[in-house]
């Protein structure tokens, strides 16, 4: 997605405008400058000028170098800890697949994510003992070996667990991906199949807002972080609810998209630019977008780029080329990237090929990542997406780094293991390398003390899952349903849907249980005779009702309220199911027992969300799902899909 080149017909006039703009920024700030620019654009359009909308910015970092917040941690310790985790994650997968073993696993994904996860764990993500509540992490499923590698250093899992990665029969192994059912005190959220994590994260973030608005739990300072792959964003579920997240003003939600430019078979957008594409998609939907493309070694070159040639070449170069650069060497980059313009060759003429090779991507620069994460957690009024450019298989050498085969690489020969050891400075002697031993220093080393200190300062270790809520709800006696049951005992017929609505109404009236019930609708309340609840308990809304409903003069008018109890998802079965999951797992994620009731139209409502239903089981969800009507008895005439 390359921006069209524009020709400047009057450079002097352009310079005058730019100088004026710089003066406004200096004297009155960027907000005033933005207002003036938007006013000028609006005036141009109103006078008939055509100014097409563009959701894209230049192919550089969103946060200028001068405005970056510097990472406060001990970077030497953090780099060594990351290196040990990289080694142990690699060793976990390679040892699992040694000899005739072919149990699978993935090395390359975590290698591209390691810096981001390290910064998050060391500086941002609040644990279960934090006074302001724990953050919720949706970890990219294929990066699970790296999370296990961290937990191993923390002492939360043993070497025996690592050896038994994907060997769980005897209860001493580790699950392939995040599975709460298999590791009930560790993983919180299953993020495979791909696409489920981003979708569920959005509705978890909205449910935190819902709990806060209804005074059930203090979730004001909690964040939901979702790590996704750039290839994963092609899943309809990944992007399908981003408009809702902006509409609901979910500033407690952060997406981090790991843009390593590759999926299993090859490039994500070989002929385009996935970061630019996602930027326009998210910005158009109303998100705050932060791009982390270039590392600090690029800063001096970008500072010299007064005529914008470097930035233009960065924009014109497609992702397939960027992948190729990191699959080769510095000489190749000099020829094929900087060689695109004579001024760029001159710019790097005093740099060696090794210097050029060290020009890093933003996702492998802790300071760039920290600045982006810090900006994201401080942003108000919008969800944030951080688009981070990385290298798939970072550190894996010629067998996988930037290669199309990176995702499938599970076995490494001795030479590659030797190179990996040297690259990350792992203190394992040559005569031990063939066995690929796990590395864990003594607990009293400065790095290990630092590892524990950082998590203790943030409220404990993550990921961690609560298996049982501290509270107990008082269940009403069966005679609460007497108004529903007694007429039927006398022989009066009643539909199952009507019985459900009456039972639900009785439960909502219970002073103890009623406030914890979460009725979830997907635009079918009138079908099921539930519209009476609109006025009774209200429909949750992020802001007060700004209009007078057309049926305001009726008893069952459409009432939206910031403290409303109903979650109305519209024509959106996946959204309804994701809200149900958020409520049904609240006993674990929020230490608050909630009881969701999701009734959907016919059984095909479940068929639309089968994978989410599987995820709900994995998460040990507790609630009620109801297929609202039976096709063979009440939907004749609706057609084959409804009747089956």
Tell me what each language-model feature is.
Residues 156-168, 247-258, 280-287, 614-632:
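A glycine-rich helix N-cap at a beta->alpha junction
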Residues 3, 20-23, 70-78, 96-105, ...:
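Glycine- and acidic
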Residues 70-101, 106-248, 271-272, 530-533, ...:
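Cofactor-binding active-site loop characterized by glycine-rich and histidine/acidic residues
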Residues 259-487:
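Long, well-ordered, tryptophan-enriched scaffold segments
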Residues 68-89, 110, 125-128, 136, ...:
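Non-catalytic terminal/interface segments that mediate subunit docking, oligomerization
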Residues 2-154, 420, 494-510, 521:
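N-terminal amphipathic, basic-rich helices that act as targeting or association modules
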Residues 141-145, 168-169, 225-235, 258-263, ...:
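Acidic, glycine-rich active-site loops and adjacent beta-strand->loop/helix elements
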Residues 152-156, 240-245, 269-279, 296-299, ...:
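Short secondary-structure boundary/capping segments
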